[in-house]
């Protein structure tokens, strides 16, 4: 009768008979409080409202034994029922109230526990997000710092290269000034090789021999750029063609648009990288020459 009383109490508290029977079976009929604890913990189970599994039928002997046991239990239950007095309405009300308070307490405890778990999960999520943001920001700062260092290094290398070029040009100018008394900065008109002033030889004048070919120490180079403009400069006859190319690169308005070649139209010739190491005299560019710039 105690089990029936507990089952009835659970049903009176609003639980279905299926849930109440499951709770009592799962807790071994230990009383209302264990059953209530079980119901609170398993109220969200998907099979909470499914009927309990029925024990399969056994042999005829087992059936008979079960029948005998059932009869005995019923007899004992009847005896117990006769001995136990039913609860009064006031007792039922008190018991129900106490059980409802227990249910509310269990629910509050569960909600508080779930709330703490959610707060902890949110803390972990935020902490993880902050760590990722810090790592990302650090990587961006490192990339920006590296890019700035690369730009500073490139600018320094460009500055040093320009200084070397300026120093070389200054040395070349000083060398030309030392050799030719500063005449290298002034345009030099090419001397006529075959023009000889006409003179009337006197009968007593000796016969003049043909002039020997003159060796030139300087040459005047004019370079025509892609836009039709021209650059002119005087170079030593023994300077390499690379000096002319360097002069063009440094004095091209706005800088050269890209790699270029030097050529002559008559005779038609495109100068190679190997020619850049040869002196102007050897390339036939003395005493004057016109070079044309062409894109590679």
Swiss-Prot record:
Residues 214-293 form the UBX domain. It is found in: Cytoplasm. Residues 87-177 form a coiled coil. Its main location: cytoplasm. InterPro entries: UBA (IPR015940), UBA-like_sf (IPR009060), UBA_UBXN1 (IPR041923), Ubiquitin-like_domsf (IPR029071), UBX_dom (IPR001012). GO terms for molecular function: K48-linked polyubiquitin modification-dependent protein binding. Keywords: Coiled coil, Cytoplasm. Residues 61-75, 191-206 have a biased composition (Low complexity). Residues 86-100, 107-123, 138-178 have a biased composition (Basic and acidic residues). Residues 43-216 are annotated as: Disordered. GO terms for cellular component: cytoplasm; nucleus. GO terms for biological process: negative regulation of proteasomal ubiquitin-dependent protein catabolic process; negative regulation of protein K48-linked deubiquitination; negative regulation of protein ubiquitination. Residues 1-42 form the UBA domain. Component of a complex required to couple deglycosylation and proteasome-mediated degradation of misfolded proteins in the endoplasmic reticulum that are retrotranslocated in the cytosol. Involved in ubiquitin-proteasome systems. This is UBX domain-containing protein 1-A. It comes from Xenopus laevis. The gene is ubxn1-a.
């Amino acid at each position: 009768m105690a089990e029936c009383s507990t089952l009835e109490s659970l049903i009176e508290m609003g639980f279905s008979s299926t849930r109440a029977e499951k709770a009592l079976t799962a807790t071994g009929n230990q009383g209302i409080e264990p059953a209530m604890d079980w119901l609170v913990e398993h109220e969200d189970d998907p099979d909470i409202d499914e009927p309990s599994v029925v024990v399969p039928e056994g042999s005829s002997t087992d059936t008979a034994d079960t029948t005998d046991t059932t009869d005995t239990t019923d007899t004992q239950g009847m005896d117990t029922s006769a001995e136990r007095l039913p609860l009064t309405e006031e007792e039922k009300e008190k018991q129900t109230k106490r059980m409802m308070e227990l249910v509310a307490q269990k629910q509050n405890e569960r909600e508080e526990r779930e709330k703490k778990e959610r707060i902890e999960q949110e803390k972990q999520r935020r902490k993880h997000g902050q760590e990722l943001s810090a790592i990302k920001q650090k990587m961006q700062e490192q990339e920006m710092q590296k890019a700035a260092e690369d730009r500073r290094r490139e600018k320094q290398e460009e500055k040093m290269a320009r200084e070397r070029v300026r120093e070389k040009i200054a040395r070349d100018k000083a060398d030309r000034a030392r050799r030719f008394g500063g005449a290298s900065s002034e345009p030099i008109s090419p001397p006529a090789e075959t023009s000889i002033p006409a003179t009337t030889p006197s009968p007593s004048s000796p016969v003049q021999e043909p002039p020997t070919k003159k060796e030139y120490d300087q040459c005047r180079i004019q370079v025509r750029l892609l836009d039709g403009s021209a650059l002119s400069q005087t170079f030593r006859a023994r300077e390499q063609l690379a000096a002319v190319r360097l002069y063009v690169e440094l004095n091209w308005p706005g800088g050269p648009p890209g790699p270029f070649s030097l050529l002559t139209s008559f005779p038609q010739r495109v100068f190679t990288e190997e020619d850049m190491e040869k002196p102007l005299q050897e390339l036939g560019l003395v005493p004057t020459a016109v070079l044309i710039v062409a894109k590679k």
